């Protein structure tokens, strides 16, 4: 699947190492390979954006290496491809040897996988399913400040799906564990690949059922009900959390404005 980059090769360049992206001038490199000193490097074509190929190059640059979060405000499709590149780069870096027999592995030529030529085992990129849910109570939405978010951002509740658990069960458990309340009328909304480090966010909306807010201090700094027209600092546009909040606000406006 990989190839040597030639002088006139052009497109979008995902240059990644250890979950970081090369972002010269704060942007994803776009244009001729020669302009970015990429000629002669090995590259994987991982998609297409605006009619041009998107290439993954497994390489560390001394300067301008940053987080994929820095491109979250770009188009959702390009952010998704950047996230794919970062996750694949880390997958290839961390799967050089077979976890069963210890022999060297090599990339598959037909799919995103690493193969062991000794025991013939096959490894795929790990994807961790998560739930994220906006909870509405009449004209208000439940928003929380997470321990890991010290920047004042308030967002909806989220968490990882456990082994042997359905998405619906995960929503009920996470909401109860983090806030102490029960929800009802759960509705699936959308999903978003989230490369921090390798999650797939499954987004839901739900209605408050019963209980009083009792936060888990290991997870949350605070949680409260906020009226739809008086909200605190929110997650940035482009995140599925922001989408859920905006959808909830729209529903409240339709009923209470």
Swiss-Prot record:
Biological process annotations from GO: NAD catabolic process; NADH metabolic process; NADP catabolic process
Annotated binding of a divalent metal cation 2, by residue: 174
Catalytic activity reported: a 5'-end NAD(+)-phospho-ribonucleoside in mRNA + H2O = a 5'-end phospho-adenosine-phospho-ribonucleoside in mRNA + beta-nicotinamide D-ribonucleotide + 2 H(+); NAD(+) + H2O = beta-nicotinamide D-ribonucleotide + AMP + 2 H(+); NADH + H2O = reduced beta-nicotinamide D-ribonucleotide + AMP + 2 H(+)
The protein's role, per its UniProt record: mRNA decapping enzyme that specifically removes the nicotinamide adenine dinucleotide (NAD) cap from a subset of mRNAs by hydrolyzing the diphosphate linkage to produce nicotinamide mononucleotide (NMN) and 5' monophosphate mRNA. The NAD-cap is present at the 5'-end of some mRNAs and stabilizes RNA against 5'-processing. Has preference for mRNAs with a 5'-end purine. Catalyzes the hydrolysis of a broad range of dinucleotide pyrophosphates.
NCBIfam families, A to Z: PRK00241.1 (NF001299)
Family the UniProt entry places it in: Belongs to the Nudix hydrolase family. NudC subfamily.
Subunit-level organization: Homodimer.
Protein name according to UniProt: NAD-capped RNA hydrolase NudC
Organism this protein belongs to: Salmonella typhi
């Amino acid at each position: 699947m990989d190839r040597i980059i030639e002088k006139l090769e052009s497109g979008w360049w995902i240059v990644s190492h250890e979950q970081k992206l090369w972002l010269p001038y704060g942007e994803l490199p776009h244009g001729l390979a020669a302009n970015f000193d990429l000629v002669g490097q090995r590259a994987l074509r991982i998609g297409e954006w605006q009619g041009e190929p998107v290439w993954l190059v497994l390489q560390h640059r001394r300067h301008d290496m940053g987080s994929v979060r820095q491109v979250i405000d770009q188009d959702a499709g390009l952010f998704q491809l950047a996230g794919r590149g970062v996750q694949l780069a880390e997958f290839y870096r961390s799967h050089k040897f077979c976890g069963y027999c210890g022999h060297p592995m090599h990339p598959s030529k037909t799919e995103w996988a690493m193969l062991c030529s000794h025991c013939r085992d096959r490894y795929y990129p790990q994807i961790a399913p998560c739930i994220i849910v906006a909870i509405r109570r009449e004209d208000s939405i439940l928003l929380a400040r997470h321990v890991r978010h010290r920047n004042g951002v308030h967002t909806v509740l989220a968490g990882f799906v456990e082994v042997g658990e359905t998405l619906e069960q995960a929503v009920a458990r996470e909401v109860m564990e983090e806030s102490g309340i029960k929800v009802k009328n759960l509705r699936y909304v959308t999903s978003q690949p989230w490369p921090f480090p390798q999650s797939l966010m499954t987004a839901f909306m739900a209605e408050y059922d019963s209980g009083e807010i009792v936060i888990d201090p290991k997870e949350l700094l605070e949680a409260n009900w906020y009226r739809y027209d008086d909200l605190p600092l929110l997650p940035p546009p482009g995140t599925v959390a922001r989408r859920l909040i905006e959808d909830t606000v729209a529903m409240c406006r339709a009923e209470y404005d």
